[in-house]
Amino acid sequence: MVLSEVWTTLSGVSGVCLACSLLSAAVVLRWTGRQKARGAATRARQKQRASLETMDKAVQRFRLQNPDLDSEALLTLPLLQLVQKLQSGELSPEAVFFTYLGKAWEVNKGTNCVTSYLTDCETQLSQAPRQGLLYGVPVSLKECFSYKGHDSTLGLSLNEGMPSESDCVVVQVLKLQGAVPFVHTNVPQSMLSFDCSNPLFGQTMNPWKSSKSPGGSSGGEGALIGSGGSPLGLGTDIGGSIRFPSAFCGICGLKPTGNRLSKSGLKGCVYGQTAVQLSLGPMARDVESLALCLKALLCEHLFTLDPTVPPLPFREEVYRSSRPLRVGYYETDNYTMPSPAMRRALIETKQRLEAAGHTLIPFLPNNIPYALEVLSAGGLFSDGGRSFLQNFKGDFVDPCLGDLILILRLPSWFKRLLSLLLKPLFPRLAAFLNSMRPRSAEKLWKLQHEIEMYRQSVIAQWKAMNLDVLLTPMLGPALDLNTPGRATGAISYTVLYNCLDFPAGVVPVTTVTAEDDAQMELYKGYFGDIWDIILKKAMKNSVGLPVAVQCVALPWQEELCLRFMREVEQLMTPQKQPS
């Protein structure tokens, strides 16, 4: 009896001790993880500062040796003229390179867009093949483009101190075409946000107004090119990540069909997700620059280095064609209410196109809520976000991700319950929650089939109207910092074309007027939910900020999409750079 009581007492003590030990271990592990994350952030910022110091010293050295160079005139040259002067010998690659390097260093002070100086670029500068289509052109790279000897952190501590062993395929092709990749630019943590901030490098600001987001996830590219610090850059796009920064920063950007360019060697935080296609594409100040970049990349070098890419060279005759186009258009997708400036931008562009002899036809892709809430959200998070969350173990979560991490960490049953409870008041949020639950392989295959069937239905709808291209609104103006992650529904105008895998590009066409800004007081949104409320507040106080439209074509018709973008650009003349 006594032994039994002693054993019971010891068992109780052991249970308490075990629980305390487990709790202590969890606390220690969390503390250790956070210490590692702090160390990673410290090292990342030290390397960033060292990179910027190296840039500055290189520029000062060059300026001392070349005091008569007219840098300002060089910076105003369109890319096509720049290339012509480089190939003719009128400009030296060194003059162009160090001029843009100095400008990048300068604009970084106000935007925090550069994460790393790709120091061996000076070797590439001396070795660039003169016959290349991009001979001597400095090119900036979104940080996810692997570059030998440099980290691609994606703003995550687990990737700090893990330099790439080789260049990704498109960087190799750029070099073979004579280009000089020179900097990595900032991204939001994990790249799954249309803001641009992370715990390693901090917040990137919009060059037009520092309280506004540059967009994301190619936000560093948008800020750098938009402020004149790079003539050409490469970004990626899985929900609008080229188009948001381009629109918010007043530049042009193209999201091609998913497999038009090689993704081999790109750094990501989730691999194997193919239901919603990732694309990579160019960003620049004008459409001609986008076309030149695409033409340079779609070459034998690319098709040899990555045989999985369809060997489709750039079709110059399609891009240069001048026949009148049949243009579908819509003023709203009835999911995200356009701001007054968005609606005006679309209407004015439509009117200019009609006056130029093109035929404009009302057209709205069918069942957009289904494409967004079921197909896109379900495709991106078919595992319930488990693979995505692996990247955050022991790390800090940046505010730009909003409530995404919290939602993904909820148990599947609780997501379902919460979805049912929210549905009467917040149907959009409820639908997204329900779609972000893990699926079986059988249900994933079914979802992928539904995506393909939806794609075919929109193509059939398009062909029935005999359309060439489509004109749509593009979200804008730029949102306040730290708000994009809390206005998820606003990706509706862009993510639809990732789900469909259609090429889509953006062109700035106007700027926000005082009247546009005043009319935002009347903005209510279509649902009056938290996303609409945040969006209304985030787009205020935007007079003078750029606003774009989106141009869309059918799969593999990038040249036609660019031709349409060029037409829009020529008809509309907004201010090109922040003052």
UniProtKB/Swiss-Prot annotation:
Q: Which GO terms describe its cellular component?
A: endoplasmic reticulum membrane; glutamatergic synapse; Golgi membrane; organelle membrane; postsynapse; presynapse
Q: How does it sit in the membrane?
A: Single-pass membrane protein
Print the keywords alphabetically: Endoplasmic reticulum, Golgi apparatus, Hydrolase, Lipid degradation, Lipid metabolism, Membrane, Phosphoprotein, Transmembrane, Transmembrane helix
Instruction: State any GO BP term from the record.
Output: fatty acid catabolic process
GO MF: amidase activity; fatty acid amide hydrolase activity; hydrolase activity, acting on ester bonds; identical protein binding; lipid binding; monoacylglycerol lipase activity; phospholipid binding
Task: Characterize the regulation of its activity.
Answer: inhibited by trifluoromethyl ketone.
Report the sequence similarity comment from the record. Belongs to the amidase family.
Q: What is this protein called?
A: Fatty-acid amide hydrolase 1
Q: Which gene encodes it?
A: Faah
